[in-house]
C-alpha cells in the first residue's frame, strides 16, 4: 500500500508517496503527490478520508506531483487503500494526458 506521510514543503502537509518502495532506500529524492482539503471534483484527484489516516475529507492532487528530498518526509500517518489504487491510476493518466 502506498504510504501517506507528513512532509515539510511550503508548509507541513500530507503527501502520498508515489516512488515504489523497493527503490526508496537507494534514492535521495522521492516522487510525491500533495494532499489537500480543497476538493474541486477534478478527474486528477483521488478522494481520501479518515480510513486513510486523515482528519477530514481530502484529495490527492495528481496535477501537482513533485520530487522532494527524502528527508522532507516526517512520519507516516496513513496509506492509500488497495481499492483506491485504480482511482490513482486514472487520476495520473488524466494528469499526464496518457489516455
What are these regions (language model features)?
Residues 1-99:
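Conserved functional hotspots at enzyme active or ligand-binding sites that engage polyanionic ligands
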Amino acid at each position: 500500500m502506498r504510504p501517506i506521510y507528513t512532509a515539510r514543503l511550503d508548509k507541513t502537509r500530507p503527501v502520498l508517496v508515489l516512488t515504489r518502495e523497493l527503490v526508496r532506500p537507494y534514492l535521495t529524492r522521492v516522487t510525491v503527490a500533495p494532499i489537500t482539503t480543497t476538493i474541486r471534483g477534478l478527474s486528477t484527484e483521488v478522494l481520501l478520508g479518515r480510513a486513510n489516516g486523515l482528519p477530514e475529507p481530502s484529495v490527492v492532487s495528481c496535477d501537482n506531483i513533485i520530487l522532494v528530498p527524502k528527508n522532507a518526509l516526517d512520519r507516516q500517518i496513513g496509506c492509500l487503500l488497495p481499492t483506491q489504487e485504480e482511482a490513482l491510476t486514472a487520476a495520473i493518466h488524466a494528469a499526464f494526458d496518457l489516455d
